[in-house]
């Protein structure tokens, strides 16, 4: 029998997973892979990190939605989000600022920590151990 906590974990897991997939696919289809690699390099980061970021966002988002290795995936996505905090740190706090501030990626990192603590919740393909 599922509890309210299980359904809360499900809501966080699925909504967060959908956002990760959307952001990963945006890097592929809107910014393009070469554009994303170029952007990473313009920040002084190695270009291969763009590929790792895209893979983490798409695969991690799918794993969250399906409820597979939920705790590990949520924890693994936190460094990606902290990298986004760093990227957006020069734009100020508010995400509505030009270039996007760092409030959204920081909040999203906190959500991943909550998902890691809660586990997969209801309707997971591979439920987390309590």
Regions found by a protein language model. Name each.
Residues 29-44:
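Membrane-interface interhelical connector segments
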Residues 1-29, 47-55, 59-130:
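Extended, low-polarity transmembrane helix blocks
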